[in-house]
């Protein structure tokens, strides 16, 4: 039996993170004699629905990983300094200092000074797209990032920027760009939502102008003679809620969203997707809009990405609605996008399986 430890982000209430972690489950469930144990560094946590379940163990000491054959660092921003500084600190006990949090992050995510463990590591689907020289001026961070990546078995990032950045920081030659982990989530068990009439679904919550974006989505739907359905992607309905949202997306005629993993879900389900984000957004946090723009561009779908500023400009409104309707109706373009994504997802899955088993 091959034992696999998977280090994940803390997923509570985040449907995108559930999709990410179910993606690995869809892969390893096809493998014989492979046992997966999920860890995060914040808390013991479990959640289930009628179709799926996820269980996370608390990782509090790197020694817990010693008896595993492989260690997968899976998804999200786990290796980015801003994640360690803000995400983890915000979810820890208030009596811990930042220095204590940083040390914990260093030891449990980067496996600092543990080359024996680092050599077992497969880095998959994480991102460093916002890394910069100011962050790299933290010598401790640069040192432990280089050390982990030099020793890792393989490094696969979810965006082209991260794959390029790490190749300049690490001597490891086994570096690649692969799809977001959520693309590996096999949703065949989830049935399409069947409604009386065709509909366009939407969900917003990241770009800071939800009401205006909702108004825009409804006008697009009306122009296409479709009902408009709000997914409420970011509500706290947990794993059962995610399953329902996927069902609604599967049955829709299209999706308009400013939420990264909501857009990925639409593309995975072969639904036409319009992504929205602030063109003036800077890369200042894990929720910055630029990650959506990068994703749509590297997926040959940049024509389906709209700057929110354009929607907020009333002079653009009529033409933008008409143009968005045309983009949602361009079946040939969507077939090309879906074809590339499906081929790459399958190829990346095969590569990951090989790395797990060898």
For each predicted feature, which ranges?
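Active-site anion-handling motifs in enzyme catalytic cores
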Residues: 1-358
């Amino acid at each position: 039996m091959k034992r696999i430890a998977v280090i994940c982000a803390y997923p509570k209430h985040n449907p995108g993170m559930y999709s990410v972690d179910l993606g690995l489950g869809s892969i390893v469930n096809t493998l014989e004699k492979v046992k997966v144990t999920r860890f995060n560094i914040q808390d013991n946590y479990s959640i289930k629905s009628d179709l799926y379940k996820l269980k996370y163990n608390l990782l509090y000491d790197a020694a817990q990983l010693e008896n595993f054959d492989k260690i997968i660092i899976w998804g999200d921003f786990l290796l980015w300094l801003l994640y360690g500084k803000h995400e983890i600190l915000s979810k820890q006990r208030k009596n811990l200092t930042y220095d204590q949090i940083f040390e914990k992050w260093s030891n449990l995510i980067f496996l600092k000074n543990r080359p024996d463990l680092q050599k077992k590591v497969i880095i998959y689907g994480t991102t460093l797209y916002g890394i910069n020289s100011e962050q790299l001026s933290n010598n401790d961070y640069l040192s432990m990032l280089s050390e982990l990546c030099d020793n890792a078995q393989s490094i696969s990032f979810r965006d082209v920027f991260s794959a390029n950045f790490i190749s300049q920081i690490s001597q490891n030659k086994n570096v690649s760009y692969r799809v977001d982990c959520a693309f590996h989530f096999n949703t065949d068990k989830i049935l399409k939502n069947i409604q009386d009439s065709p509909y366009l679904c939407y969900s917003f919550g990241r770009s800071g102008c939800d009401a205006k974006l909702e108004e825009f989505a409804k006008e697009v739907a009306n122009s296409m003679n479709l009902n408009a359905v709000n997914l409420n992607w970011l509500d706290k309905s947990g794993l059962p809620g995610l399953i329902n949202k996927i069902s609604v997306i599967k049955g829709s005629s299209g999706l308009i969203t400013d939420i990264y993993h909501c857009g990925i879900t639409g593309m995975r389900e072969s639904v036409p997707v319009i992504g929205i984000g602030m063109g003036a957004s800077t890369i200042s946090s894990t929720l910055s809009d630029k990650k959506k723009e990068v994703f749509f561009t590297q997926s040959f779908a940049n024509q389906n990405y709209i700057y929110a500023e354009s929607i907020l400009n009333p002079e653009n409104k009529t033409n933008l609605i008409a143009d968005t309707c045309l983009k949602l109706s361009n079946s040939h373009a969507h077939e090309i996008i879906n074809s590339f994504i499906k081929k790459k997802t399958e190829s990346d899955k095969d590569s990951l399986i090989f790395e797990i088993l060898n």
